[in-house]
Every structure is written in structure tokens, then in C-alpha cells.
Amino acid sequence: MQKIRKGDKVVMLAGKDKGRTGEVVQVMPKEDRAVVRGVNVVKRHQRQTQTQEAGIINKEASVHLSNVAIVDKDGKPTRVGFKVVDGKKVRVAKRSGEVIDG
């Protein structure tokens, strides 16, 4: 089970976007990376194809999972733990003890 999943609201802990929050768009568990909406935006030069025109586009690049943390209810970053509730393994915020997904 992953600690950070698609749709989670996360905050950046390090890098040029430190402190910014965003929603996880994609998680790549084999590479330990995630794509976060509005964070780590880079410019890519795109070649013209039949469907798309050439130009410079802004695209979100992936960030390492160690540089993101889930945002708790009070808006501060929290670590994630696991607990068994009613025979199901659920994610729990270490800061508040609340179940993240349920």
C-alpha cells in the first residue's frame, strides 16, 4: 500500500517550489516519483505533429516522493502511518491521528 496516492493534497518539502501545495496527478511507485499539479513546472520545446503545433509548452515534471508530504486538516505537513480498522488497512496521519481515507 502506498503512502501517497493520486488525488492526495500534498505540500513540497524541498526544492524550488518548497512550501507550495498541490494535488497529486500521477504516482510512479517503481521510480518513487509523483507528478503534482502546479508544482515543478518546466518548459518543453515541442516539435510539430499532425495534431499539435510546434512551440514551447509548460508541463509538470515529476518530483521525488521524499520531497512531498500529505497536508493534514490544519494545513501542515504530516507523515503517514498505517492502522487496521474493521479488518481493513487504512492510512493514518501521524500528526493528528485521523484516518486519511476511509
Swiss-Prot record:
Q: Which GO terms describe its molecular function?
A: rRNA binding; structural constituent of ribosome
Keywords from the UniProt entry: Ribonucleoprotein, Ribosomal protein, RNA-binding, rRNA-binding
Among SUPFAM superfamilies, the record links this protein to: Translation proteins SH3-like domain (SSF50104)
Q: Which GO terms describe its cellular component?
A: ribonucleoprotein complex; ribosome
Signal peptide coordinates = none
| Keyword RNA-binding assigned | yes
**A GO biological process held by the record:** translation
**Quick check: keyword Membrane in the entry?**
no
Which InterPro entries does the entry mention? Answer: KOW, Rib_uL2_dom2, Ribosomal_uL24, Ribosomal_uL24_KOW, Translation_prot_SH3-like_sf
Family membership, please give it: Belongs to the universal ribosomal protein uL24 family.
What does the record give as the function of this protein?
One of two assembly initiator proteins, it binds directly to the 5'-end of the 23S rRNA, where it nucleates assembly of the 50S subunit. One of the proteins that surrounds the polypeptide exit tunnel on the outside of the subunit.
HAMAP family hit by this protein: Ribosomal_uL24_B (MF_01326_B)
Assembly, in brief, is: Part of the 50S ribosomal subunit.
Please report the name of this protein according to its UniProt entry: Large ribosomal subunit protein uL24
Phylogenetic lineage: Bacteria, Pseudomonadati, Pseudomonadota, Alphaproteobacteria, Hyphomicrobiales
What is the primary gene name for this protein? rplX
